Amino acid sequence: MTDTPDPAAVLSPAVKAAILSEALPYIRRFHGKTIVVKYGGNAMTEERLQRSFAHDVVLLKLVGLNPVVVHGGGPQIDDALRRLGKQGTFVQGMRVTDAETMEVVEWVLGGQVQQDIVMMINEAGGKAVGLTGKDGMLLQARKKLMADKEKPGELLDIGLVGDVTRVEPAVVKALQDDQFIPVISPIGYGEDGTAYNINADVVAGKIAEVLGAEKLLMMTNTPGVLDKSGKLLRSLSAQTIDELFADGTISGGMLPKISSALDAAKNGVPSVHVVDGRVPHCLLLELLTDQGVGTMISAH
């Protein structure tokens, strides 16, 4: 399939100059600040969107922001499992992870996917370095047990799925100080060395909290958070989110995403947004323009 042209390619020089002028106050505001980006969805699988993402990240670094990328890789994991004759299973948006699946997760996320992202950013002119939770003890974790919605009071064991117990930010800060762009795979490690599969949205939220990030951007395959009629909700408060959870408007993979976004907002991240990763240059649109894209999550 032929890639659709980048919309920026058809803009006149005058329009491009106006866009750059609009970005200036935002560049000043965010200069030196950490921006955590959860990278996933179509933006990881379509070549045109991959290029625009890499260019956005490099540009943000060049103008003085400190981007940190936390990536997913669900479709790539599913493809690898299918080749082994396995079918992915999910509970409340979390992948059930047995030992064989965990080996696949480590290989796909910590190897193939991470290396592709690092190479893509480097080819765009940046300096990216890949990390997993094991590097510098970045992500310490324990086994996650989930509440059974069918049997109140009981817990579900979904295998080698983890909760983050501690984030050690030293290795990320050291890379930032040396002008590198960290690219983090969401694999945590227990005290006994057991590897855990951790939802990338959860990891992005925890990383943003510990690094004192100015913004957390979560890329998705929708315009943002939608109501039951499919209309974009531009902003969500904690109370509204609770209502959307209760009536089933937010479900599936959106559950951990919005829960993590809300936790990050409650724990001090000033600005949390769910953005449409299908839009080329969505990071620049959200960070450096008046309009922005997606849904803003507020703790209040």
Curated annotation (Swiss-Prot):
Keywords: Amino-acid biosynthesis, Arginine biosynthesis, ATP-binding, Cytoplasm, Kinase, Nucleotide-binding, Transferase. It is found in: Cytoplasm. Its main location: cytoplasm. It holds the Pfam family AA_kinase. GO terms for biological process: arginine biosynthetic process via ornithine; L-arginine biosynthetic process. GO terms for molecular function: acetylglutamate kinase activity; ATP binding. Pathway: Amino-acid biosynthesis; L-arginine biosynthesis; N(2)-acetyl-L-ornithine from L-glutamate: step 2/4. InterPro entries: AceGlu_kinase-like_sf, AcgluKinase_fam, ArgB, Asp/Glu/Uridylate_kinase, Glu/AcGlu_kinase, NAGK-C. The keyword Transmembrane helix does not apply. Catalyzes the ATP-dependent phosphorylation of N-acetyl-L-glutamate. Belongs to the acetylglutamate kinase family. ArgB subfamily. NCBIfam families: argB (TIGR00761). This is Acetylglutamate kinase.
